[in-house]
Amino acid sequence: MSRRRRADKREVLPDPKFGDLVVTKFMNYVMYEGKKAVAENIVYGAFDILEARRKDMGPLETFHAALDNVAPAIEVRSRRVGGATYQVPVEVRPERRRALAIRWLVNAARSRGENTMTEKLAGELLDASSNRGSAVKKREDTHKMAEANRAFSHYRW
């Protein structure tokens, strides 16, 4: 544990186009080397593609549906008990759920095969909103791991 005091949570401002805090967080995860304008163009470009491809839902609804489908409810954490390390399933706090979902979506998008990051991100968001894709698979794997280690759930802290 750190001996210092806990770091304060920084407030992020809502994004200019949709006025959504989660979209700003998402942009910050997409951003490289402080290039916010580039990240903004990528995310808004992906939202434009979503709007064109998916007529039944708006881009913001598709984005939030994708996040909900990727967010894990439970994960495993290592716990050392008497020389043995157990993978103990624990519930995920809401803030961490959202952070993991965003991280998994961005990483899954980066590893896709399309040409531009805008297309990759739009494709992954579309897949995740309809419960497919690498990010959803990552969530399923996490849940499977927690289910497999359910016997150790009494070691929860």
Swiss-Prot record:
One Gene Ontology term from the biological process aspect of the record: translation
GO cellular component: small ribosomal subunit
UniProt-listed Pfam families: Ribosomal_S7
UniProt keyword annotations, A-Z: Ribonucleoprotein, Ribosomal protein, RNA-binding, rRNA-binding, tRNA-binding
SUPFAM superfamilies documented for this protein: Ribosomal protein S7
Similarity section: Belongs to the universal ribosomal protein uS7 family.
PANTHER family linked to this entry: RIBOSOMAL PROTEIN S7
Quaternary state and interactors: Part of the 30S ribosomal subunit. Contacts proteins S9 and S11.
Name of the protein: Small ribosomal subunit protein uS7
Name of the gene this protein is made from: rpsG
